[in-house]
């Protein structure tokens, strides 16, 4: 009994002690923000003073830590002054950190993944946070950067979800090569293949296989650094001649386990549509709408055709670890129903990254990524294979619902269903529902990526690092067409089965040294890299000839059976001549060094030498390019007062090569498409004296921050000259070849980029941040190859072409025009129609340049307590837009203009009257291969729009301490403040050179409204 009593008393005393101990500790949570910017700070060190008890703020700036009333919390962050807060009985402690004017600024990820302080850079570089791409998401995340950086131009393809985008820094430089920048993920260059992007042709049906940006989960992105000039990206060599986009993905933070969930749902509707007449009916065998006036208005068939699109973008991530081991895992998926019926897109992304210490000075990391994309009925610009042609051109007064529900009928002569339409012989347009169900393009893409690195800190100043990454892409494209597709062109059907494989193995070794001697500092890196790229492409292609008898004459033995055996029996084209296998290798050595004096003067030197397999058969198999730059922090050399936090002048000069297209220096044999088993010899002479393109780049500018970092600005002037361009010219007759390659040409770009921002924290509850950026680019063709009397055509369509001439600019547009008399009035022929002039350069008219000279963006963000309001207005001035869609609507009599003209009974042009049908069937496009007066269908590209708008609220500690939910109403492409073109000037046919600003039945750009949810634990 006494023993039990003793144990009871002991347990009671222990319990009281423990209760007292626990009563002395409690959990403190809070939010840490930048006082000047108002933004949450990620990765702030929060510790209990004098102890090892510490944590870090999460991706939303929140923290949670166990404390006692007598404790003092210490908050530390790079570039900010330390802060201390006494705990007492407080359970929520929010902190505003003040920028440290004495410390160097933000860390910037530069070429090869080398991190440097922004103040030491000798060239222009801008870093944007992950919030810029995941607050208002785009399926292709690069589109979320539109208008947010000076000098960055992004033009999405008109192919809908999963499509690629044209990305351009500082104008077009290369005439025959790519003008896209290099994409770098975590310091390593990635494959940027775009498989089958739309080319510059009217017919269409080309596939947009997407780009690497469309495979990235935006919620995995920590930051993006834009290296716009050659000096910034020179260490990457030829592949980065057009600049580089450095993407840093998220990693786990030591001592913190976090779970983040994101869900973004939007509804999409067409932002802008053509205007149609609904008063005059069809005629001419169910093709055109030049018939009599209807007794009642017709439906707007285009509005009937489109539906409200739906997109959901979800992701979840788990991250955690300690000082010795950290891991990050994420999964993201996208599902989209497009604005056109039967159009779907889905994608899955898996990402994992682990890093750990092997020893105290050896660090290892591994990463693995997988993405899968699937699309069905992806839009394709052009006349053929495009359901929009039927939806737009169907004769007014047609029973739309009948053809929608009965898009096919049985044909006993062929023994199968065939297309049912107002005119089944017309190749240019067909029943859109037949196309969506019986000409269905299906695309699937898999992308695998495995990488790793090892870093050894030999001394505090010296380390060596090795990295390797393997990537593989697998693309499969099927586009089978059932019997009667494209009018009578494929009466028994067509098979197309395309497979494209790409592999890249990259590796490098870097030695890094960093040391300070008194006022002097040296940062140096030397290394070597190799890149091995291999691609293969097989295209099974079978097509039938015109149907000539009930027995099924033609090349297809049985209709609608899409197998090689069915085509083998009556073979026309079973292997496309584009079937190929390529392999390329690039080895390089490089070095860069920066010398600093008193943290105020910095000198940069870098050099790289490439050995490319594409130059193996030339007189020189390598090319060398250097760069030099300097920056001076004037505020550290000259007293400027406390209001000047930074005033820096910088300048750089560099020479960067642009790699040579594969097989240009050596003969290449190919399969002959029209003779199975035969080999086709090349018709171009090998380029044995080949030299790589070289871009000479000069830039200088200044950066500044004032008034305790409230005001910041940046200005850069640049000038680039790209020489040794590649041209194909006629070969001497005696050579037996048709063409030969030569080096020639000089394309110059010069202009400026500027940005200014103001960041004001009015009080603890209210903050405002605004930024305005603007860029100007002037392009000039200084030299072309000799003997081009009529210039060089880089893109052409029916009655229009883009031509380069010495003294002209990249993107100069020439169009067909009507004949005029001495007084400038239109000339009539005997039939009362205008007279079209020819399509020679002497007859065509210069219509302006398709590229805008000025681009701008203006961002505003307001924080009030837990509310956040932000919007982006952007636009461009200049440029021209060509709309073959409008020309065709006129030629077919379905545009609003043609209806108004018939109501008026005439068309008056410069004082000359024409009958509406006589005028519009001549100047408009009455068939996809008929000439028309393109001069009337060129519009100004200038436009200003509300690009983004969001209003959000953060529910703090909703599910416990530090567990927050942020909900935001979001909108994208809301409306135009100004626009001249009848289509979206920023949507293009493809990513190739010279096809931006062209509308040939492009999918309308979308206006999206939705909800974004973010939950963090």
Place the predicted regions along the sequence by residue.
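Extracellular/periplasmic, surface-exposed regions of secreted and cell-surface proteins
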Residues: 180, 291, 309-312, 347-349, ...
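Glycine-rich, aromatic-lined ligand/substrate-binding cores of catalytic
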Residues: 849-882
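Acidic, glycine-rich flexible loop segments
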Residues: 311-312, 383-434
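Short aromatic-centered micro-motifs
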Residues: 34, 46, 75, 183, ...
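Extracytoplasmic gating/loop element in the C-terminal half of outer-membrane beta-barrel translocons
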Residues: 612, 876-966, 970-971
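Conserved small-residue
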Residues: 260-295, 538-552, 742, 759-850, ...
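Short, small/polar-rich motifs associated with maturation and membrane association
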Residues: 1-351, 355-371, 449, 456, ...
């Amino acid at each position: 009994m006494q023993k039990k009593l003793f144990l009871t008393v002991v347990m009671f005393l222990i319990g009281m002690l423990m209760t007292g101990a626990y009563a002395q500790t409690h959990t403190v949570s809070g939010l840490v923000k930048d006082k000047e910017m108002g933004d949450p700070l990620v990765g702030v060190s929060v510790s209990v003073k004098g102890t090892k008890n510490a944590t870090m703020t999460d991706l939303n700036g929140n923290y949670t830590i166990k404390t006692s009333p007598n404790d003092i919390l210490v908050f530390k962050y790079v570039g900010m002054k330390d802060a201390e807060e006494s705990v007492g009985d407080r359970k929520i402690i929010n902190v505003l950190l003040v920028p440290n004017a004495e410390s160097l600024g933000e860390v910037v990820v530069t070429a090869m993944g080398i991190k440097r302080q922004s103040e030491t850079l000798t060239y222009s570089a801008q870093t944007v946070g992950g919030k810029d791409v995941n607050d208002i998401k785009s399926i292709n995340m690069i589109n979320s950067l539109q208008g947010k950086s000076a000098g960055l131009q992004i033009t999405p393809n008109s192919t809908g979800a999963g499509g690629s985008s044209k990305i351009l820094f500082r104008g077009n430089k290369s005439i025959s090569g790519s003008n896209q920048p290099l994409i770098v993920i975590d310091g390593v260059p990635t494959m940027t293949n775009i498989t089958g992007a739309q080319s510059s042709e009217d017919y269409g049906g080309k596939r947009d296989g997407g780009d690497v940006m469309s495979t990235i989960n935006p919620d995995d992105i920590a930051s993006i650094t834009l290296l716009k000039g050659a000096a910034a990206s020179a260490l990457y060599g030829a592949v980065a001649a057009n600049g580089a986009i450095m993407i840093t993905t998220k990693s786990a933070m030591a001592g913190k386990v976090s779970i983040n969930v994101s869900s973004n749902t939007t509804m999409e509707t067409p932002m802008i549509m053509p205007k149609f007449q609904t008063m005059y009916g069809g005629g001419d065998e169910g093709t055109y709408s030049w018939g009599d006036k209807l007794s009642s208005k017709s439906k707007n068939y285009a509005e009937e055709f489109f539906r409200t699109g739906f997109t959901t973008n979800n992701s979840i991530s788990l991250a955690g670890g300690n000082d010795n081991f950290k891991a990050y895992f994420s999964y993201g998926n996208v599902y989209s129903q497009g604005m056109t019926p039967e159009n779907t897109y889905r994608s899955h992304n898996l990402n994992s990254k682990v890093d750990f210490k092997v020893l105290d000075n050896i660090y290892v990391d591994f990463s693995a990524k997988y993405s899968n994309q699937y699309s069905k009925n992806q839009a394709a610009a052009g006349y053929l294979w495009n359901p929009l042609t039927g939806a737009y051109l169907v004769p007014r007064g047609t029973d739309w619902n009948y053809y929608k529900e009965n898009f096919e009928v049985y044909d006993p002569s062929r023994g199968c269903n065939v297309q049912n339409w107002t005119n089944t012989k017309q190749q240019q347009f067909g029943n859109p529902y037949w196309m969506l169900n019986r000409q269905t393009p299906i695309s699937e893409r898999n992308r695998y990526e495995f990488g790793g690195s090892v870093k050894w800190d030999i001394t505090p100043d010296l380390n060596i690092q090795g990295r390797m990454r393997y990537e593989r892409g697998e693309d499969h494209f099927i586009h089978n067409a059932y019997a009667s597709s494209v009018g009578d062109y494929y009466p028994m059907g067509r098979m197309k089965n395309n497979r494209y494989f790409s592999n890249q193995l990259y590796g490098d070794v870097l030695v890094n040294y960093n040391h300070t001697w008194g006022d002097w500092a040296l940062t140096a890196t030397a290394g070597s890299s190799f890149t091995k790229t291999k691609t293969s492409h097989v295209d099974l292609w079978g097509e039938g000839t015109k149907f000539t008898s009930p027995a099924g004459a033609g090349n297809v033995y049985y209709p609608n059976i899409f197998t090689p055996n069915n085509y083998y029996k009556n073979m026309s084209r079973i292997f496309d001549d584009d079937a190929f296998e390529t392999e390329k290798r690039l080895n390089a050595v490089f070095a860069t060094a920066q010398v600093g004096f008193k943290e105020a003067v910095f000198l940069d030197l870098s050099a790289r030498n490439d050995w490319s397999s594409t130059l193996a058969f030339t007189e020189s198999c390598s090319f060398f390019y250097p760069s030099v730059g300097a920056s001076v922090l004037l505020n550290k050399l000259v007293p400027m007062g406390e209001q000047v936090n930074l005033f820096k002048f910088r300048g750089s000069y560099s020479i960067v090569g642009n790699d040579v297209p594969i097989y240009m220096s050596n003969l290449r044999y190919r399969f002959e498409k029209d003779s199975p088993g035969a080999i086709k010899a090349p018709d171009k002479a090998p380029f044995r004296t080949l030299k790589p393109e070289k871009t000479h780049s000069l830039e200088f500018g200044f950066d500044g921050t004032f008034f305790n970092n409230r005001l910041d600005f940046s200005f850069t002037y640049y000038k680039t000259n790209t020489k040794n361009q590649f041209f194909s010219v006629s070969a001497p007759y005696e050579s037996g070849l048709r063409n030969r390659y030569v080096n020639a040409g000089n394309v110059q770009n010069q202009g400026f980029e500027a940005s200014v921002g103001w960041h004001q924290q009015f009080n603890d509850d209210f903050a405002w941040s605004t930024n305005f950026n603007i860029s100007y680019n002037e392009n000039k063709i200084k030299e072309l190859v000799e003997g081009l009397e009529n210039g060089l055509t880089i893109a052409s369509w029916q009655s229009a072409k883009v031509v380069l001439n010495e003294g002209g600019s990249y993107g100069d547009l020439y169009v067909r025009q009507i004949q005029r008399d001495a007084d400038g009035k239109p000339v009539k022929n005997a039939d009362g129609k205008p007279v079209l002039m020819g399509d020679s350069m002497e007859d065509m008219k210069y219509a302006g340049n398709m590229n805008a000279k000025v681009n701008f963006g203006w961002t505003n963000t307001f924080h009030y307590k837990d509310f956040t309001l932000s919007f982006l207005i952007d636009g461009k001035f200049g440029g021209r837009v060509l709309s073959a869609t409008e020309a065709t609507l006129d030629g077919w009599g379905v545009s609003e203009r043609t209806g108004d003209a018939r109501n008026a009974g005439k068309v008056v042009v410069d004082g000359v009257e024409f009958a509406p049908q006589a005028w519009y069937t001549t100047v408009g496009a009455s068939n996809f291969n008929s000439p028309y007066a393109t001069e009337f269908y060129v519009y100004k590209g200038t436009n200003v729009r509300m690009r983004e708008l969001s209003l959000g609220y953060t529910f703090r500690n909703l599910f416990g301490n530090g567990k927050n939910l942020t909900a935001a109403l979001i909108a994208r492409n809301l409306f135009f403040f100004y626009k001249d073109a009848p289509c979206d000037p920023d949507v293009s046919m493809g990513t190739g050179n010279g096809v931006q600003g062209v509308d040939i039945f492009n999918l309308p750009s979308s206006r999206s409204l939705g909800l974004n949810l973010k939950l963090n634990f």
